[in-house]
Amino acid sequence: MNPPPERPRGMSYPYEFKCLISQLKSTKTQEFINEYTKDSAKLPSENVTEYKYTDAEDMLTELCELYSYGEESTYKSNSEAFEAVIKKLGLPRSWKLLSDAEKMSILMSLANDLDHRNVRVRMRASEGILYIAQGCWADLVDTEEHAESIGFNGILLYHFGIFTSFVDLLKIEVANFHNKKELSENNSRNLRIILNVLYTITEVIRKEKNNICSEYTHHVESFCTEMLFNDESLITILFDMLVRFCDCHTYSYHFPLKKVLLLLWKLLLIALGGLSELEETKKEIRMDNGLPPEHDSSEEQQPDPNRFLDVINLIDLIGESSQRGRVKKRPKVRQEEHNKFLRNARLRFEDSNVKDDDTDVVGLPAPICSSIEIIKKHLYTPLGQRHVEREKLVRSHPDTHPDEIELTPAELIYEMLFPNFNEYMVSLLKVVLWCGKFRTERLFSGRPPISGLAPEADPNSRILYSVVLYIDLFRHNEIILKAVSAILLLLLKHLKLNNVYQFEYMSQCLVTNNVLTILMAFFKQNIAGFVTTLNEIPALNFTECVTGTSEIKADCLNQVCTSTVSSRNMFFCINFLRVLNKLVKWKPARIEHLESFRNSKAILNRLVEIKHDTIKLYALKLLKMQMKYTRKNWRKRHVHLINEIYNRVRLHMNDSFLTYVPPKMTRDKLEDHKDENLLRKDIAEFNERRYGDLEKQQHIDIDFCTRKVVETQWLLPYCLNRAHHELLTQEFLC
């Protein structure tokens, strides 16, 4: 038997995990896997277009992704913990048959056990609460009934204060988790139970927030308030857990990373809002700043026989005939492009230029004046420009223009994350590096082991369990990438809407840590076959295990390839493309860095071949930015790409993306990064002026003088002074 794959120094895999990993490399297992995946590399292009990009999947699908296939044995343990409480109180076993008073008595008993000193008692009560959060599935057989039960129980648990209690439990377990030098699977099991309860309640709140006719709107508002206005928010706790895991993974390899990232993503999604809420908020903010709403959509272009009289319109019509029903976006013109056009026209026809005058057209020919009118008609002022203008006024005239900070959700989250923002971004990029490898020989290289993944293997069916592990490993990576991509995109979009300097600071943190290279290396893989490979075993999903049979048989693998496209993989591929577009848009230095990546245009060309409109759109946008650095021969060979760019990507009125810029005419290195350096300086001044106090709190000098510490008068709360002797007796003298 082959030795286990290479691992980071200082790590040790569990024995069962070693055996299954070694079994993965055996000849019989590889033949089984190759037969299982032989049809996965085919690209059914007509079915890829069926995927609809949304903020997240439905509640049950998201809950299924929370659990690994190796956690199926814990479902029964949760049910037994609940039955023990029922037996203790002398109540009927069925949750549906209990009255409201009896349900409250059960929750009261479990909540009391959560405060017990014994860890085993606390965790046993947590298992019982997790069974309730899972919908009390023992009496259910229907999926719809199961979803309703999860929704009702989740709201009931939040109303009873279980969510806050589990946040406190999480703090205790995290503190104990990192104080121990030797960890085992049991230490991670406690964290997994707590995170499962928190995530299930969060997912129920997300479902109620998306439901316009929900009866629990006040619970959603209370949840958002608790996330944003708490002194120690759960969002910050989860980010700190992520940083500790990435920095000290040699000691905490049992850390449930997937559950942490999934919970963090859903908390940000609830607090900040999804894409539809973002567009509505953007329209309101633009109107408050005196700007018209963004004209992204227009009427669908339909063929018109009268347009054959115009040759240019005829060319457009031919392009539309092959892409019927596509929404055409109006072109935009920036203010600096308008000023540049007017300045060049004056220098050409009047041999003069007037500074700070962008309206005078006296002396210019009539065609130029008509062109300027058309440009003004399509003039678009981005919201970030207003942010920059307001920041300049605050800096130059602080007395007459005070900085009025609106406490929006994005502002509050930025204040939470600012002291350690760079560490958080580095940790997310490390996770992308670990999980962005989709070859079997690279699956374990340079990354910590995964806890709660290996099922209990039967020696008689070792190959079958190895195949399940193989599928679950890739599934685990895909879910982690899905969460990380959504977190990055959510933060980028909402911070850009709140204040452009916050967005630029996050972009700077990511670009400085080589996010462009990391994402391009990720897309260098076979993405076309990857988005159609479904690493899923429906028979082992959470909903199927609790309502049916969870026994692993060879027949259950036949259900894997029923779907032809992986919505999970499509989701984070689109997200990563959108993140790349956000980071390099209107940044020449970053575009050149992206273009300098080996075979970057070939990588994007392969993405364009995927027949999905959203992936194709963002890949074409990246190609359009790099087009001015491509030579004539490349453009001749890829005329179809230029045609696709004209048909799909929004163009500017005086767009010159086809103008070739030879290397000898490019700016030197200092001039090329001049804008980046100025932007970095503005960001530093913005953060120092607004959040300087938050950063200073992280660098307070500590006085280690014992005498001064003893002489210091500490003011204790009244309740602590009153119960001081009782506390000493219970905690220290017993």
Annotate each PLM feature.
Residues 2-734:
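Extended alpha-helical scaffold domains
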